Amino acid sequence: MGAILRQSGKRRNVQTFFISIGARYKRIRKRPRGVPSPQLYEYKVEKLQELEKQACEGRIRLYYADESHTCTEGYAPYGWQLRGEDVYIPSQRVARLNIFGMIDRDNRYKGFTTSEKMTADKIVSFLDEISFNLKMDTFVVLDNASVHRNKKIRELRPIWKQRGLFLFYLPPYSPQLNIAEILWRILKGKWMRPQDYITSDMLFYTTIELWRI
């Protein structure tokens, strides 16, 4: 009985402590996968706004980076069609061109394309090369994809910081914060024409040439 009373006393002490600091005893809520923590989201947005301000003042360079691809299967956008009209995009799943690109709010772009699989090694090599040619501190905004958080990137981040290259990770499941997502939608929905998907040669040529404009 004495042991039970001692345990009960401990529970009351714990309750008293939490009540004293303003805590409430309530059921812990479940959060569906794919929804970022509100606290983390707010913190990251605040930090990103600070970086945006510094970039506008010319104190840093701020890029938003992401991967995408074009393929001969084609991209099917929305469009007006007359009744009985057969509007289509030529489609064949033969070739794919992967893209890693970075863009800032002044539309300065850096990136590369490859017909091979987009790997962490390729991204690391690209970022490492950039780190040698910086004129000011440069921040690259990334999502949390595994290729952005691999071991090699973790090992090189301290070295890149010394060269003036910094990585900023968005909160999970927040593509709306990455303006590179807009770039891909424009690429596939406006810049690429239906005839650009007919052959792999035309697809690759058009995609690469668009980045040179």
Each language-model region and where it sits:
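Short functional hotspots at interaction and active-site rims
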Residues: 1-213
